[in-house]
Amino acid sequence: MAVLPLLLCLLPLAPASSPPQPAISSPCPRRCRCQTQSMPLSVLCPGAGLLFVPPSLDRRAAELRLADNFIAAVRRRDLANMTGLLHLSLSRNTIRHVAAGAFADLRALRALHLDGNRLTSLGEGQLRGLVNLRHLILSNNQLAALAAGALDDCAETLEDLDLSYNNLEQLPWEALGRLGNVNTLGLDHNLLASVPAGAFSRLHKLARLDMTSNRLTTIPPDPLFSRLPLLARPRGSPASALVLAFGGNPLHCNCELVWLRRLAREDDLEACASPPALGGRYFWAVGEEEFVCEPPVVTHRSPPLAVPAGRPAALRCRAVGDPEPRVRWVSPQGRLLGNSSRARAFPNGTLELLVTEPEDGGTFTCIAANAAGEATAAVELTVGPPPPPQLANSTSCDPPRDGEPDALTPPSAASASAKVADTVAPTDRGVQVTEHGATAALVQWPDQRPVPGIRMYQIQYNSSADDILVYRMIPADSRSFLLTDLASGRTYDLCVLAVYEDSATGLTATRPVGCARFSTEPALRPCAAPHAPFLGGTMIIALGGVIVASVLVFIFVLLLRYKVHGGQPPGKAKATAPVSSVCSQTNGALGPVPSAPAPEPAAPRAHTVVQLDCEPWGPSHEPAGP
């Protein structure tokens, strides 16, 4: 009996033999399906009509599908502590905003689908924490800006990046160049106008590059393209081949795209948009010899300029060519000039010296270069002594204009500047412009017999008021051309080029025939129209006079007709019958009764009853009537 109490005391110390209880899981969100029977856990909520990310998500889930809903934003707390999530789909929602750090806890995430939303930009903190991300799908959004550091955390692991169907005009090309493991890069259907040289040189694992339907006019050659074989069709291509797609771009087919034409490609959709001679033609049907460039020609440069020291000066240089030449400036000391504290170089060929110094005087050289060659022009700058300080009683505070003489400019420099300003650049002996009026000019050039194989002549000209270059293609047997539709009172720079076939290379080349400058006559000033208030008052007076005259004529006609009909209206004069008054005599004597005048036979008798204050007659006294 003593053993029983001892056993009762030892019973609480015995180990529990029941199995361990599983961890309590979160309930499945409403309208969602949760697969919790087997690992990994999945939460599936596609097309559930959700307005936000459900707060009761199981944080142990490895897959979360929230596609085809109405979620407008992703907040920081929506996906917090989901460290085991591998796949996240937010496709086809209405997401406009992703909070910074919204994916910071998703360090195991491998695939993120944000396509079909309304994102307009992607900042540096919105993808922070995705250190294992491999697939990033951002297509069919409204992205217009992509921050340079937006992909920093996933740059080493990203394999698939899709930015297609957005509004991207620029990309952080330096950041894209760090995606060393990317296999597929989709940039199609955006607004990209240019690609820098070497943008893809470090993407050694790139297998597909799609830049279809952008605004690219040229594509610079890249070491990646020359190192790998390129095929347009992915089917049947070897594993190491690069699939390259550039269709739907307005390509400018000149010598800069010869490298692309030499590649062995099939069934692609590239077409030429320019120059006009090749516009609309299939890219691969254009012969390699037709991809030509035109060397630059300097069409306008500043005349010799004289300014006092300390004042600004602007040197201008304009050049034309295909492709558009790039203009650079070289100082009199032989240094290449660029943007600095004292100088600014603009893309249109203008060099602005903010503060001139005596050592700046000399000959500046303008160099216009493109893929076909280069052209140079010299501009003289004379820097005079600095002006004295303005006096207190000075009546003018405006500095003299560049190139105009003033009291501080040496006489020689002033006269030289005035002479250059008043004269026009000399005309090339080979090209003459005659019979130029207000809107037309006749251009003539000599025969180019020393140049064999001339196909045509090209005339390039523009006015001093704008930089738009106008081209005219002339047959090879012509020696003159009449330019029409010119603006009156403007100065034009014109060059004639001979397009011929180079016998050495077999390619089409151009050779300058000559340039000329001419001015159209000012248009005749038309006669001034009458002043508007004066014209209006005159019209009112004239109309009033006509109305008054009409009224007077009408009144005169009425008076005339009234007088003709004896003072009675014409209608009533014809309708009234003559009436005679007959009265009886009180003394019984009946006097003679005056008879009424006989009516006209043609006029009908009018039966008119007239009541008179007279004595009645008897039957025997009734007058005999007709």
Swiss-Prot record:
Disulfide topology: C317-C366
Bilayer-crossing regions: 540-560
Residue ranges, Extracellular side: 17-539
Annotated tissue distribution: Expressed in brain, testis, stomach, small intestine and kidney. Residually expressed in heart, lung, liver, skeletal muscle and uterus. In the brain, weak, but broad expression in the cerebral cortex and diencephalic nuclei. Also detected in other parts of the central nervous system, including the olfactory bulb, pons, cerebellum, and medulla oblongata, as well as in the peripheral nervous system, such as the ganglia of cranial nerves and the dorsal root ganglion during gestation.
Record domain LRRNT: where: 19-59
Processing and modification events after translation: N-glycosylated.
Alphabetical list of SMART domains matching this protein: IG, IGc2, LRR_TYP, LRRCT
Spans of repeat LRR: 84-105, 108-129, 132-153, 157-178, 181-202, 205-226
Domain LRRCT, residue spans: 249-295
Keywords, in A-Z order: Cell adhesion, Cell membrane, Cell projection, Disulfide bond, Glycoprotein, Immunoglobulin domain, Leucine-rich repeat, Membrane, Postsynaptic cell membrane, Repeat, Signal, Synapse, Transmembrane, Transmembrane helix
Localization (cell): Cell membrane; Cell projection, Axon; Cell projection, Dendrite; Synapse
Residue ranges, Cytoplasmic side: 561-626
Gene Ontology CC: axon; cell surface; dendrite; glutamatergic synapse; postsynaptic density membrane; presynaptic active zone membrane
Signal peptide: 1-16
Membrane-protein topology: Single-pass type I membrane protein
Low complexity composition-biased segments: 406-425
Top-level taxon of origin: Eukaryota
Fibronectin type-III domain sequence ranges: 425-523
Ranges where the record places region Disordered: 382-425, 590-626
CDD domains from the UniProt entry: FN3
Domain spans labelled Ig-like: 295-382
Primary role: Cell adhesion molecule that mediates homophilic cell-cell adhesion in a Ca(2+)-independent manner. Promotes neurite outgrowth in hippocampal neurons.
Domain commentary: Lacks a cytoplasmic PDZ-binding domain, which has been implicated in function of related Lrfn proteins.
Subunit-level organization: Can form heteromeric complexes with LRFN1, LRFN2, LRFN4 and LRFN5. Able to form homomeric complexes across cell junctions, between adjacent cells. Does not interact with DLG4.
Family: Belongs to the LRFN family.
Protein name, UniProt field: Leucine-rich repeat and fibronectin type-III domain-containing protein 3
Organism: Mus musculus
